[in-house]
Amino acid sequence: MKTINLNAAVKTKCFNGKYDETMWFLMAVEGDIIEVETTEGMGTDFTFTIQVHNFFTGWIYELNTVIVGKIEQNELGEWHYVTARQRAERLIEKMKKVGKLDMQHWKVVK
């Protein structure tokens, strides 16, 4: 099973000296507009996917899951709509905390 270490870095030089350049970058990519049900009724929202880019090799992988918005309950017990962008950014933060990606859930884009 292949994994990617999100904390992997390459030592590089610039005019200010040496520094570590992160190899992998996670990003949310906007997709299609779809109809969604919000707490105020029907509306529209974008779908999102998550991609991981390697700036040194040019490789791009995309998570096999399309992220859509949904209605969630907050800490106060109130219901509200969470956009697909917010959900994608939350997932990216969780991935960064773990620091590794299991590549069985990702496909090669480029």
From Swiss-Prot:
A Pfam family that the UniProt record links to this protein: Phage_30_8
Superkingdom, taxonomy of origin: Viruses
Protein name: Uncharacterized 12.9 kDa protein in Gp30-rIII intergenic region
Gene behind the chain: y12M
